[in-house]
Amino acid sequence: MTQMTDAKSGIITEEMKFVANEEGMDVETLKNLIAKGYVVIPKNVNRNTKPVGIGDNLRTKVNVNLGTSPDFVDIACELKKVEISNKYGADAIMDLSTGGNLPEIRKEIIKNTNLPIGTVPIYEVGVDAKQKYGRVIDMDEDLIFNVIERQAKEGVDFMTLHCGITKQTVNALNNDPRKMGVVSRGGAFLTAYIMYHDRENPLYKEFDYLLELLKEHDVTLSLGDGMRPGCLQDNTDRAQIQELITLGELVDKCREQGVQVMVEGPGHVPYNNIEANMKIQKTVCKNAPFYVLGPIVTDLAPGYDHITAAIGGTLAAVSGANFLCYVTPAEHVRLMKEDDVKEGLIASKIAAQAADVAKGHSIAWKLEKEMADARIKHDWDRQFEIALDSDKPRKMREEIPSKDEKACSVCGDYCALLMVEELGKR
């Protein structure tokens, strides 16, 4: 049984009750959204995961990517990133490790959080294939599905799988060449496999078998966008749209089998094209939850891509995206460090909150009202409690204090609020 099959059968699960309470919504309404495939609750039956709802009519959620690389392996560092994710309000974590003992790293990450955990299994497949055969492109079907099954048994809650990379998609790429080609790592693994062997993508060819594996453990399938644009010039091209059409067809198959599914979206999109991209996805994929990376709205800001992504993420979420994958200041430059994780997470949470306010979500507006009330009362402790990051503003206030405890050091005796407040008391 999955959350979706239960919902279709009219069963309200404990996870549905928890999410409905968190979202401030009627549980029957939530159940119906899950039954239709408009909402997912990524929760592997083998793990005691905190239930998190992703999809329409819910708050916008934020994911944190972390993980090792071939150039830097430090489990303690990754666990610190997990700690930061837990502390500053991430809704999910993805382990994208490609260096070191991948199963051991994943085990430690899972052990140190109750947030939903996602992976990209093709990374481990590629690493194993290179170690075993000498090349990533020599991976075989058995290796692919063995890794997926093993990760499902370990408790992974959602998996990014690039099932929409097909021979037809690769042809679309070849017939309409891009500036940046394929920038998705998992997408590149499978594109290279198809081009070298002239074989169909096993994840597409054996999609029914894949669904059996995922359904057994109620792993949510996150359909990866292997043809996402890697620069603004490549946005919304034929390869991207061809893959999206395929993903829409696969969403139908998932729903027929009762497998929870969401769809991943583009990374580099000009601001004026974001709304159209969201509407195309929601139409083609029939309102499946949409999970976007950014989108990044300019390629000119390495070192500041948490900002470019937050700008794009706000509009994306207002226009239909349900799940924002954070982007850190280190994007396009190096592996993220602990401070990068915090900066990226807070930036993405700002985008999510701004979008939820624009969409009129009651919880988002409740928080805004509480902040205004705290500011009117000059209640600095309460302001910092409500803030998305309480530590930074508290430290900043301590660095240059005001003589007046109610004011801040920008205005001091000339505080606008205090001046009018004093006059009102006369």
From Swiss-Prot:
Specify the domain of life of the species encoding this protein. Answer: Archaea
| Family indicated by similarity | Belongs to the ThiC family.
Q: Which reaction does it catalyse?
A: 5-amino-1-(5-phospho-beta-D-ribosyl)imidazole + S-adenosyl-L-methionine = 4-amino-2-methyl-5-(phosphooxymethyl)pyrimidine + CO + 5'-deoxyadenosine + formate + L-methionine + 3 H(+)
Instruction: Extract the InterPro entries matched here.
Output: ThiC (IPR037509), ThiC/Bza_core_dom (IPR038521), ThiC/BzaA/B (IPR002817)
Q: Which organism is it from?
A: Methanococcus maripaludis (strain C7 / ATCC BAA-1331)
Q: What does this protein do?
A: Catalyzes the synthesis of the hydroxymethylpyrimidine phosphate (HMP-P) moiety of thiamine from aminoimidazole ribotide (AIR) in a radical S-adenosyl-L-methionine (SAM)-dependent reaction.
What protein name does the entry list?
Phosphomethylpyrimidine synthase
- Report residues binding Zn(2+): 268, 332
| GO molecular function list | 4 iron, 4 sulfur cluster binding; carbon-carbon lyase activity; zinc ion binding
Enzyme Commission identifier(s): 4.1.99.17
